[in-house]
């Protein structure tokens, strides 16, 4: 249920109490980014750091849709997974550095719990948006399986995660992101080898598989597909994920500890973001950026999925 309200007599409105809680903290942090980061990158940093997309105008969203980057600009499951991996690796490194900790809690268990706690904390910072909650539930299933030392295949873990998401929010099946996220993960697990350690080749393979595999579903859900999206994602995913987003998070964490300490990280993140954004704007304005497809029926979707699978 969504609604928009307004105040009839603004002059008569008065604040009864100062804002409190996580939402008030997020609002204050978002305002700090807007005030202390100059240039056009501030709205995007607010979205990447806090999931606050209110400052993005129609032109920005049009560019993101045309280049297939909408899934990266706001806090998504991918970002939550990145934070979870960071905490897991950090705790695992501490356990390797201090082997005595393993007598209290096995390293694998500690890393799994740290990943879950880090993902949950980041989801709260993001305002508990549905994509972040969905990813936290997936991570919780994986952590539970590891802590309980249960042997489960990837298919079983995905099925349990799907069940957990539906128990949390049954109406999520009406959201396109639900189908795209689970279909994308399932497609990658099915098509990609699990023992491929070549990072560049694995990234290119994952990008190709995700693009081809999700193309029929994307066209069916939205009636359009970004033809330049694969090329834009080849640059945006590694650059934004491993440079811009970490700097945004470092700045937010430092700013939460001491006001003013995170400005340098935000400004550096803005500079790094602006290195790539003009190119994406140009790419989104090309005549071949978007492919519009008439509405299709279920038979066409099934045929397209079979073709992608083949």
Q: What spans do the regions from the language model cover?
A:
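Membrane-interface helix/helix-cap signal primarily in integral membrane proteins
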Residues: 1-71
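Active-site/binding-pocket entry motifs
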Residues: 11, 54-55, 120, 241, ...
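Catalytic cores of large soluble enzymes that bind and process phosphate-bearing ligands
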Residues: 17, 21, 25, 40, ...
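Generic alpha-helical secondary structure signal
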Residues: 24, 28, 43, 55, ...
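Hydrophobic face of alpha-helices
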Residues: 26, 30, 45, 49, ...
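Alpha-helical transmembrane segments of multi-pass integral membrane proteins
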Residues: 185-288
């Amino acid at each position: 249920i969504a609604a928009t309200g307004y105040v009839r007599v603004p002059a008569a409105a008065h604040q009864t109490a100062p804002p409190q809680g996580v939402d008030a903290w997020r609002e204050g942090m978002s305002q700090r980014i807007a005030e202390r980061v100059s240039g056009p990158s501030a709205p995007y940093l607010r979205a990447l750091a806090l999931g606050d997309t209110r400052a993005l105008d129609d032109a920005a969203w049009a560019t993101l849709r045309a280049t297939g980057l909408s899934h990266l600009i706001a806090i998504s499951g991918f970002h939550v997974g990145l934070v979870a991996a960071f905490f897991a690796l950090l705790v695992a490194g501490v356990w390797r550095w201090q082997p005595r900790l393993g007598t209290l809690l096995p390293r694998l268990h500690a890393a799994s719990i740290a990943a879950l706690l880090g993902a949950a904390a980041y989801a709260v910072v993001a305002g508990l948006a549905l994509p972040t909650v969905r990813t936290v539930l997936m991570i919780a299933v994986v952590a539970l399986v590891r802590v309980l030392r249960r042997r489960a295949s990837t298919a079983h873990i995905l099925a349990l995660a799907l069940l957990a998401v539906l128990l949390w929010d049954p109406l999520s099946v009406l959201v396109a992101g639900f189908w795209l996220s689970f279909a994308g993960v399932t497609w990658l697990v099915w098509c990609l080898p699990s023992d491929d350690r070549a990072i560049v080749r694995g990234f290119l393979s994952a990008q190709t598989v995700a693009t081809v595999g999700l193309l029929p579903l994307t066209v069916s859900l939205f009636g359009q597909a970004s033809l330049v999206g694969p090329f834009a994602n080849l640059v945006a995913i590694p650059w934004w994920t491993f440079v811009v987003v970490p700097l945004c998070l470092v700045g937010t964490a430092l700013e939460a500890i001491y006001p003013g300490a995170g400005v340098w990280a935000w400004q550096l993140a803005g500079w790094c973001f602006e290195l790539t954004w003009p190119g994406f704007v140009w790419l989104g304005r090309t005549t071949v950026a978007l492919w519009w497809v008439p509405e299709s029926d279920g038979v066409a979707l099934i045929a397209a999925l079979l073709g992608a699978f083949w």
